Regions:
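Bacterial N-terminal signal peptides that target proteins for export
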Residues: 1-17
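Hydrophobic helical h-region of N-terminal Sec-dependent signal peptides
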Residues: 18-23
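C-terminal motif of bacterial Sec signal peptides marking the signal peptidase cleavage site
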Residues: 25-28
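Bacterial signal peptide processing site
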Residues: 30-33
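Short, glycine-/small- and polar/acidic-enriched structural segments
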Residues: 36-183, 187-192, 196-204, 219-220
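Pocket-lining segment of extracytoplasmic ligand-binding domains
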Residues: 106, 185-189, 193-281
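Secondary-structure end/capping motifs
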Residues: 245-324
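Conserved C-terminal helix/tail region of periplasmic/extracytoplasmic solute-binding proteins
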Residues: 315-347
């Protein structure tokens, strides 16, 4: 199983209960039905954004920008589409079959070693969400106590290496724990006591679910525990088209400008973000969704300005992936990151 497939199939399975395979959810969320920008009468440019999975709290900036008309103000009519498979984004953008998509920094770096025609153009969630989460009912009070315990994962090899790095900080190795792939989902495995902890869960999603279920989770974001900082969710675009198609490059700039407005609005008003995502985020109770959205909103903050990505930070993470055997070829971060399309800070 590829790392992207594992990340989607394992981690997101528990989130999408009752959801259908493909969702096109933009039309009713604020895009102009007339196909024109009402402020100036100009025709809107249609574009599609392929999500990484079903609509969920990680996507609040997208849906709030849509609801507030921020994309329309940039001259765009944006459609969000959920993938039929979580490996779709990189492939379809590389082939030019969808203009933009949501992906992850580790997968984008891996795509660079595979020759895929993609580049990251903006960080939507500019910090790591992946966390080691320990059940409060396990009797384990810190990662140091995980020796001899069973830890669940979604099968993503990146997460396994992240766990290795976390354990190293506490003078443990993977050989001292039992790592199992929990096909039934990370949260059910914790609830049933099959595992004492999970890796691959997000601090703003699974940690909230587990707390609501009374497991009193202890949450350790991997980037605070020995893993290099990275951008969890990124916008990816077609690299060749960016270099050769001026209209496409303009569209990407306009999309990022609109998304930046949505991210700022979500941070300023998590209640507004909740109202925007609630109609499309399925499989959550209203109370749980609210807690997730309120936990997610501050994580959108980027001290360098919305969407900003550090090529040096990406290089550090790519080097870590290479040193841990997650990629077999070295990657020049500048080949998979284009940091020049996001709005200038303060604009």
């Amino acid at each position: 199983m590829s790392m992207t497939a594992a990340r989607g199939a394992g981690r997101r399975a528990a989130l999408a209960i009752g959801a259908v395979a493909v969702v096109a959810a933009a039309a009713a969320c604020g895009a102009s039905s007339s196909g024109t920008n009402e402020s100036n009468g100009k025709a809107l440019t249609n574009t599609t954004v392929l999500l990484d999975w079903f609509p969920n709290p990680d996507h609040i900036a997208l849906y709030l920008a849509q609801k507030n008309g921020d994309f329309t103000a940039q001259g765009l009519k944006v459609t969000f589409q959920s993938p039929s498979n979580s490996t779709d984004a990189l492939k379809l953008v590389s082939l030019g079959q969808v203009p933009l998509a949501i992906s992850y920094e580790p997968e984008t770096i891996t795509a660079g070693t595979q020759g895929l025609n993609v580049t990251a153009v903006g960080a939507m969630v500019p910090t790591s969400l992946n966390s080691l989460i320990i059940s409060g009912k396990s009797g384990v009070t810190s990662p140091a106590g995980l020796a001899g315990k069973t830890i669940g994962t979604d099968g993503d090899p990146v997460s396994a290496q992240m766990l290795k790095a976390v354990l190293k900080k506490y003078h443990l190795t993977l050989s001292q724990i039992k790592l199992v792939t929990v096909n039934e989902g990370l949260v059910p495995a914790m609830v049933t006591g099959k595992v004492a902890a999970i890796i691959s869960g997000y601090r703003n999603i699974e940690a909230i679910q587990l707390a609501a279920l009374g497991l009193h989770p202890r949450v350790y974001p991997v980037s605070t525990q020995g893993v290099p900082q990275y951008d969890e969710l990124v916008i990816i675009a077609n690299k060749k088209k960016l270099a050769t198609d001026a209209a496409y490059r303009t569209m990407v700039r306009e999309f990022l400008a609109g998304l930046g407005k949505g991210a700022a609005a979500a941070q300023a008003s998590p209640a507004a973000a909740l109202a925007a995502i609630s109609p499309v985020a399925k499989g959550y109770t209203p109370a749980m969704l609210k807690k997730m959205v309120y936990a997610t909103a501050p994580l959108l903050h980027n001290s360098a300005g919305f969407g900003a990505m550090s090529v040096a930070q990406w290089q550090s993470f790519a080097n870590w992936m290479k040193s841990d055997g997650l990629i077999t070829k070295p990657v020049q971060a500048s080949s998979v990151v284009d940091p020049n399309l996001v709005p200038k800070s303060g604009s």
